[in-house]
């Protein structure tokens, strides 16, 4: 009971200027979250907000603040994890769920950005600068390849060139680029794909292939 009274006090204090309060349902592994946000108009919520994350079996309550906690609300005071401004997955491949908290649309071409927090001992989450920067320098939230233990990011250089890069993550918070691909569609009659692979010794190998638009479309079905 004492734990939940403390949580309520934190929630009330941090959300003193907030106008809307929600509970996030169906987070993984039993995690629970409440969020406060400055305001909502129609179904769109945004502005300054706070996230209160806790687990019934842990003593720690984590509080994350955001300058622009944007998300689409549903009906009532509950929102599903999928529609919330939170993403809980294992970003660092250590078997523990980490969390991404929305911070607005500050990435390239107004793409969404997130603050990333890595789970440590006893349910405590600490800020992860390296992963946060990935969301600011590329377009949107990175994807996870569990088989390769890689983080996948994308970007658009100009109107016709799209970039994909893959990074390995080490426990020392180091990101190592090991694969990049650029797809150039500036010529309507061809697609030029350049791939660079880097092995663990740092040796690079670059290949360039040209496809017709129809061939490229078939390859990416």
Question: Model-predicted segments: where are they?
Answer:
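Beta-propeller fold detector
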Residues: 63-67, 126-133, 176-182
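Repeat-based blade/solenoid architectures
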Residues: 66-85, 132-142, 161, 189
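Beta-propeller blade repeat segments, especially FG-GAP/WD-type strand-to-loop junctions
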Residues: 54-57, 110-129, 166-171
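Acidic, small-residue rich beta-repeat scaffolds with periodic aromatic anchors
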Residues: 17-52, 146-221
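Beta-propeller blade termini
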Residues: 21-26, 36, 80-91, 136-150
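Acidic carboxylate motifs that coordinate Ca2+ or other divalent cations, activating on Asp/Glu
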Residues: 94
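Hydrophobic beta-strand segments that make up the repeating blades of beta-propeller
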Residues: 99-103, 151-154
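Sec-dependent N-terminal signal peptides
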Residues: 4-13
């Amino acid at each position: 009971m004492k734990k939940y009274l403390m949580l309520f006090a934190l929630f009330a204090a941090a959300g003193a200027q907030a106008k809307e309060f929600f509970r996030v349902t169906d987070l993984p592994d039993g995690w629970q979250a409440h969020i406060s946000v400055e305001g909502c108009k129609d179904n769109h919520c945004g502005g300054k907000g706070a996230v209160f994350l806790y687990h019934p079996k842990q003593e720690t309550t984590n509080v994350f603040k955001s300058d622009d906690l944007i998300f689409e609300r549903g009906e009532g005071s509950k929102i599903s994890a999928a529609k919330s401004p939170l993403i809980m997955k294992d970003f660092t491949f250590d078997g523990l769920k980490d969390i991404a908290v929305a911070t607005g649309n500050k990435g390239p071409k107004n793409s969404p950005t997130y603050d990333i927090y890595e789970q440590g001992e006893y349910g405590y989450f600490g800020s992860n600068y390296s992963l946060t920067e990935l969301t600011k320098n590329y377009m949107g939230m990175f994807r996870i390849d569990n088989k390769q233990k890689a983080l996948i990011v994308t970007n658009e250089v100009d109107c016709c060139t799209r970039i994909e890069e893959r990074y390995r993550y080490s426990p020392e918070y180091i990101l190592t680029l090991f694969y990049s691909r650029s797809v150039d569609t500036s010529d309507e009659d061809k697609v030029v794909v350049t791939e660079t692979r880097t092995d663990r010794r740092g040796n690079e190998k670059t290949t360039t292939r040209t496809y017709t638009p129809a061939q490229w479309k078939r390859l990416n079905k």
